[in-house]
Curated annotation (Swiss-Prot):
Xref: PROSITE patterns: DHDPS_1, DHDPS_2
Gene Ontology molecular-function annotations: 4-hydroxy-tetrahydrodipicolinate synthase activity
A GO CC annotation given for this chain: cytosol
Superkingdom, taxonomy of origin: Bacteria
Stated role: Catalyzes the condensation of (S)-aspartate-beta-semialdehyde [(S)-ASA] and pyruvate to 4-hydroxy-tetrahydrodipicolinate (HTPA).
Protein's recorded name: 4-hydroxy-tetrahydrodipicolinate synthase
Enzymatic class: lyase
Catalytically driven reaction(s): L-aspartate 4-semialdehyde + pyruvate = (2S,4S)-4-hydroxy-2,3,4,5-tetrahydrodipicolinate + H2O + H(+)
Pathways per UniProt: Amino-acid biosynthesis; L-lysine biosynthesis via DAP pathway; (S)-tetrahydrodipicolinate from L-aspartate: step 3/4
Species for this entry: Haemophilus influenzae (strain ATCC 51907 / DSM 11121 / KW20 / Rd)
Catalytic residues identified in the record: Y139, K167
Length: 298
C-alpha cells in the first residue's frame, strides 16, 4: 500500500458536529471527540461531511470547524475536510479556503439537486482539482444527491493527479470491483455504507467512511484492521454485533439517530441539530437504544 493509500484507509469517522441547545458549535465537546477517536484507534476523521451537518453550516462555520478539528488533532490523525457543494464555484471557494488549513485532503460530493450529466460531473470535479494541490476524494451518494456518478466517469477523473479516491455509497458492492478495474488498483475506494463496509473491504476497498464509527469507534477500528489483514472471521464477529446498529442509525435521516446515540452514550452534551433536522423521535429512541445494547455499548 502506498503512503497516500495508507493515509486514506481503514476506519475513517464521518464525524458529527456537536452543538449546544442554541445550535452553536460546541468546540470543547469537539475537542473531546477528537481525543476519543485518537484513543480508540480510528484512522482518520472527516470534518463537516454529511454527518457533520455541512449543509446547515455557513462556509465560514465549515472552515472554522475544520480548522479547529485540525488544531485539536495536533498531527496525530489525518483530517479530511468536507468541501463539496452543488455549485462548482462554491466548491472551489471552499477548497481554496482550506489550502493552508493542514487537512490531509478534501471529500467532495457529487452535486445535489441540480442533477448534472456525467460530463457535468466530470467538469465539476476537474475544475475543483485544478484549483488546489490538496488530494481530492470524490463522494458518490445517489440516495442523497439524486444523481449517480458511473464508474466510467470515476475512471476518467482518476486520470487527474490529485483526484486520489472515492467514497462509494451506493450499497452496490460490485461497484468496488468495477471502479478498481477501470480506475486502477492505486485509486482508493472507500465504502460509504456501514452495513456493506466489510463486504466492500473483502472486494478490495481500502476502508470505510463510517457513521457507526461515531459511537463504536474501537469496534470499527478493530473490524477494519482485521479485515484489511485478511482475518475475516474476527472481522465478521465484530460486524455481526454491530449490524443492527448499522441499520438503525439510518432509521431517520442521518445524522439524527447517531447524534442521539452519541448523546445517550455521553459522547456529546446535546443531541441538537440545526433545522430542518430535528432530534430523534421519542417513539424511535427505544429502538436505537436496543441497537446500542445489542452492540454491547450500553
Amino acid at each position: 500500500m502506498s503512503a497516500q493509500n495508507s493515509l486514506f484507509s481503514g476506519s475513517i469517522v464521518a464525524l458529527v458536529t456537536p452543538m449546544n441547545h442554541y445550535g452553536e458549535v460546541d468546540f470543547s465537546c469537539l475537542e473531546k471527540l477528537v481525543e476519543h477517536h485518537i484513543e480508540a484507534g480510528s484512522n482518520a476523521l472527516v470534518s463537516v461531511g454529511t454527518t457533520g451537518e455541512s449543509a446547515t453550516l455557513s462556509i465560514e462555520e465549515n472552515v472554522k470547524v475544520i480548522e479547529k478539528t485540525v488544531e485539536f488533532a495536533k498531527g496525530r490523525i489525518p483530517i479530511i475536510a468536507g468541501a463539496g457543494a452543488n455549485a462548482t464555484s462554491e466548491a472551489i471557494t471552499m477548497t481554496k479556503l482550506l489550502r493552508d488549513s493542514g487537512v490531509a485532503g478534501c471529500l467532495s460530493v457529487v452535486p445535489y439537486y441540480n442533477k448534472p450529466t456525467q460530463e457535468g460531473m466530470y467538469q465539476h470535479f476537474k475544475a475543483i482539482a485544478e484549483c488546489t494541490d490538496l488530494p481530492q476524494i470524490l463522494y458518490n451518494v445517489p440516495s442523497r444527491t439524486g444523481s449517480d456518478m458511473k464508474p466510467e466517469t470515476v475512471a476518467r477523473l482518476a486520470e487527474i493527479e490529485n483526484i486520489v479516491g472515492i467514497k462509494e455509497a451506493t450499497r452496490d458492492v460490485s461497484r468496488i470491483v468495477k471502479i478498481k478495474q477501470l480506475a486502477g488498483k492505486n485509486f482508493i475506494v472507500l465504502s460509504g455504507d456501514d452495513a456493506t463496509g466489510l463486504e466492500a473491504i473483502k472486494l478490495g476497498a481500502e476502508g470505510v467512511i463510517s457513521v457507526t464509527n461515531n459511537i463504536a469507534a474501537k469496534d470499527m477500528a478493530d473490524m477494519c484492521r482485521y479485515a484489511l489483514a485478511g482475518d475475516f472471521d474476527k472481522a465478521e464477529e465484530i460486524n455481526a454485533r454491530l449490524m443492527r446498529l448499522h441499520h438503525d442509525l439510518f432509521i431517520e435521516s442521518n445524522p439524527i439517530p447517531v447524534k442521539w446515540a452519541a448523546y445517550r452514550l455521553g459522547l456529546i452534551k446535546s443531541p441538537h441539530l440545526r433545522l430542518p433536522l430535528t432530534t430523534l423521535s421519542e417513539e424511535i429512541q427505544p429502538k436505537v437504544g436496543d441497537a446500542l445494547k445489542i452492540a454491547g455499548l450500553l
